[in-house]
Amino acid sequence: MRFLIRLVPEDKDRAFKVPYNHQYYLQGLIYNAIKSSNPKLATYLHEVKGPKLFTYSLFMAEKREHPKGLPYFLGYKKGFFYFSTCVPEIAEALVNGLLMNPEVRLWDERFYLHEIKVLREPKKFNGSTFVTLSPIAVTVVRKGKSYDVPPMEKEFYSIIKDDLQDKYVMAYGDKPPSEFEMEVLIAKPKRFRIKPGIYQTAWHLVFRAYGNDDLLKVGYEVGFGEKNSLGFGMVKVEGNKTTKEAEEQEKITFNSREELKTGV
């Protein structure tokens, strides 16, 4: 299930600030909403190790400006983000929690819930072109240190495949399909501060994926790569009927399709 969550700022006549490093705040909003509706589920999600089976996009605005040298952009009109999960209980708890508490505090801004819209999912995934709504993160430990793997390395693809198969087992309880290939068309790195002193280099991508439809659907629903519950790995399918906002986000993320091309 996939939702568009649209928020209206407290003061509609002025711009609102959105820090570039904001995933942590959205994570807090999501967990607090789930907790207010289903405390047991929130505790389980907080304590369970491994994938949480949900993901969300970066925070966006209907119109925005990027002042030079500042750690935030300015948003106008409404703000919004996308949320996706394959677990109905998580979806229900989030929606109910947001409706119960429509006043939303994010960073130093106050918003009010404007609408929650259920989005139509694609009927087919094999051979589709995917565009990230939040960057994809892949990490390994090398020589005792955490290393963020780029899509120029083959290990990037094997890790994503293994991760998808693990999520498939969690979602369906069956042996995962093995058919999976990923062809990156465009890649753009972004470095994020997850928490004070903790950083992650992740990748905004345009890529084609081939393989079992159910396996690819897992990536679409709960995210590709790692740290999905921290706001990484959400994608949309290019050509699928989507919202005007998602199309605008693609334009912002990829100002030029020649910025950086790669393929392994």
UniProtKB/Swiss-Prot annotation:
GO biological process terms on file: defense response to virus; maintenance of CRISPR repeat elements
Thermal dependence: Optimum temperature is 70 degrees Celsius.
Cited Pfam families: Cas6_I-A (PF21350), Cas_Cas6_C (PF01881)
Gene3D superfamilies, per database record: 3.30.70.1890, 3.30.70.1900
Cofactor: binding comment: Does not require a metal cofactor.
GO molecular function term, any single one: RNA binding
Entry keywords, A to Z: Antiviral defense, Endonuclease, Hydrolase, Nuclease, RNA-binding
Marked site: Transition state stabilizer: K52
Function in brief: CRISPR (clustered regularly interspaced short palindromic repeat), is an adaptive immune system that provides protection against mobile genetic elements (viruses, transposable elements and conjugative plasmids). CRISPR clusters contain sequences complementary to antecedent mobile elements and target invading nucleic acids. CRISPR clusters are transcribed and processed into CRISPR RNA (crRNA), also called psiRNA (prokaryotic silencing) in this organism. This protein processes pre-crRNA into individual crRNA units, with an 8-nt 5'-repeat DNA tag that may help other proteins recognize the crRNA.
Subunit structure: Monomer, binds precursor but not mature crRNA; is not part of the Cmr effector complex.
Family per similarity comment: Belongs to the CRISPR-associated protein Cas6/Cse3/CasE family.
Protein's recorded name: CRISPR-associated endoribonuclease Cas6
Organism: Pyrococcus furiosus (strain ATCC 43587 / DSM 3638 / JCM 8422 / Vc1)
